[in-house]
């Protein structure tokens, strides 16, 4: 077993090591800042699957996210499901934010209001820089499927959306590909040409570092 001092030294070295966030699904910062934040904001992405597995119904999920309902009512409805999922990796990530970013020991009856207020307070321009660059020491983020959205900070890179060229099984997808390439599709040859134009556009973009299917 490593000594306490060795553990501390290793943790300090890890904290000071710049990292690459190799898989992100972050929206552009501007629209994110327009969205009201509260305790449930931390659980709306990957944790949703765990909540459903813990027994949350469609009605529960809708109520958790319904800002027209009193915050306390939403918390009381959410609380038993948090108890069921809190040891899972996704919930632990959310609770790390509560502890290390927001400064609360845990998300509880006595802190859900404060956590909600603090999440809203920090939801201001520069949020990504403060959390990703300054707090997490991230040198680059690789964003999935958001190539034509933005703007993003200059340390964001992109995985191009592979379905644009491989998932063209219906008319809507064909029309979308045609519009993006400004090239009509009336034959298989036209489709292949649009696929090639799309891939060439990705290859020419220095912010594109790969393709995600």
Predicted regions, residues:
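Metal-cofactor-binding active-site regions of metalloenzymes
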Residues: 2-213
């Amino acid at each position: 077993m490593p000594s306490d001092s060795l553990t501390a030294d290793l943790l300090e070295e890890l904290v000071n090591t710049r990292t690459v966030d190799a898989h992100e699904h972050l929206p552009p910062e501007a629209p994110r800042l327009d969205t009201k934040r509260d305790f449930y904001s931390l659980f709306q992405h990957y944790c949703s699957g765990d909540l459903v597995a813990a027994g949350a119904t469609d009605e529960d999920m809708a109520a958790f996210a319904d800002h027209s309902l009193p915050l306390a009512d939403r918390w009381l409805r959410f609380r038993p499901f948090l108890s069921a999922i809190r040891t899972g990796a996704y919930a632990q990530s959310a609770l790390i934010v509560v502890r290390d970013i927001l400064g609360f020991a845990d998300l509880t009856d006595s802190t859900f209001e404060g956590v909600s207020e603090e999440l809203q307070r920090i939801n201001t321009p520069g949020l990504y820089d403060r959390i990703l660059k300054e707090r997490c020491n991230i040198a680059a983020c690789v964003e999935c499927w958001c190539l034509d959205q933005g703007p993003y900070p200059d340390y964001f890179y992109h995985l191009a959306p592979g379905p644009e060229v491989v998932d063209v099984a219906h008319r809507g997808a064909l029309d979308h590909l045609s519009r993006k390439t400004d090239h009509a599709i009336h034959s298989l040859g036209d489709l292949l040409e649009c696929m090639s134009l799309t891939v060439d556009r990705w290859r020419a973009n220095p912010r594109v570092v790969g393709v995600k299917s």
